[in-house]
A protein has these predicted regions:
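Alpha-helical interface subdomain recognition
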Residues: 1, 12, 24-29, 36, ...
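Active-site nucleophile and cofactor-binding loops and adjacent substrate-binding regions
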Residues: 7-14
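Helix-loop "lid/cap" segments that line or gate small-molecule binding pockets
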Residues: 16-24
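A short, Trp-centered hydrophobic/proline-enriched beta-strand micro-motif
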Residues: 40-48
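Active-site-adjacent elements of ketosynthase-type condensing enzymes
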Residues: 52-63
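Flexible, small-/acidic-enriched active-site or ligand-binding loops
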Residues: 59, 112-141
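A short core secondary-structure module
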Residues: 70, 74-117
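Glycine-rich phosphate/pyrophosphate-binding beta-alpha loops
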Residues: 78-83, 124-125, 162-166
Length: 271
């Protein structure tokens, strides 16, 4: 993770798209979709966010109604990572079993299903694309529903909890890489007749980076340990790990670039 933005694509995005199936899908569904994702032959995507339903995921308006032996999906999703290149989407839609979050279900929708339309490819600087997707009378078999009806919101939150920890772990790798580069620099470059590493101010800055890195690691390991010990929810632990680690990583890179590698990391501007 410390050397490539692909960590975001491979761990967070590829895993996020298939995570709900791993956690809640039937054995048949898992055997159908997961092997090709695991080998990298197919790409998965997680379709929850909508134009008017971001953090308030329960406000989504995409619907899935039963007609004969099919669910018919109608609605729009946006800011979908891997959108436009994914082979299938894990889609969350209202099925109406109950009001609010208890009326949301989860489905697997193959990208080549009639009615799946990529309406916008969102321009971003990222290792994976983002897109807006419309489901226009998209018919899928009843067997494409993940788990029980009405439990989609709970599935989405459980999946996000795990991959918040994954995003935090990737950020930890970035931060450690920044520290490794800084240590290499201060040991090899001399100032005032001795290596930079002998300067107290430099040692303090390296200490700050190490503190952020170790704190990130401990929060991440706590979230993982809690989940491994059968906790039903790790929302608090995962959110704390992601918040701290994703803020620590750019801070460590900024310290590394501005204090030790300003020539390598900077840009030359001709006025």
């Amino acid at each position: 993770a410390g050397f490539s933005g692909l960590a975001d694509f491979v761990f967070a995005m590829q895993g996020l798209g298939s995570g709900t199936i791993s956690l809640f899908g039937s054995a048949e569904m898992q055997s159908k979709y997961l092997p090709d994702v695991r080998t990298g032959q197919k790409i998965a995507a997680f379709a929850l966010t909508e134009p008017e339903a971001g953090s308030d995921a329960a406000a989504l308006t995409t619907t899935a109604k039963i007609e004969d032996d099919f669910f018919v999906l109608d609605g729009e999703k946006t800011l979908i990572s891997n959108g436009g290149i994914a082979d299938y989407y894990t889609v969350f839609a209202k099925t109406g079993e109950a009001p609010g979050t208890r009326g949301i279900s989860a489905f697997v929708v193959d990208a080549d299903t009639p009615g799946v339309e990529i309406t916008e490819r969102i321009k971003v600087i990222a290792p994976h694309p983002l897109a807006r997707i419309r489901f226009n009378k998209c018919r899928i078999p009843l067997a494409q529903q993940i788990g029980k009806g009405g439990e989609g919101f709970k599935m989405a939150m459980a999946t996000l909890d795990i991959f918040r920890s994954t995003a935090a772990a990737a950020s930890l790798g970035f931060a450690r890489h920044a520290l490794d580069e800084a240590l290499e620099r201060v040991k090899s470059r001399k100032m005032f007749g001795s290596p930079m590493s002998n300067l107290k101010l430099i040692q303090a800055k390296l200490g700050d980076m190490s503190l952020d890195i170790d704190a990130s690691a401990l929060l991440i390991y706590r979230a993982a340990w809690t989940k491994d010990n059968s906790a039903e929810k790790i929302t608090r632990e995962a959110a704390m790990a992601k918040l701290f680690a994703t803020e620590a990583a750019p801070t460590c890179y900024r310290r590394s670039c501005t204090n030790f590698w300003w020539i390598r990391c900077g840009f030359r501007i001709r006025c």
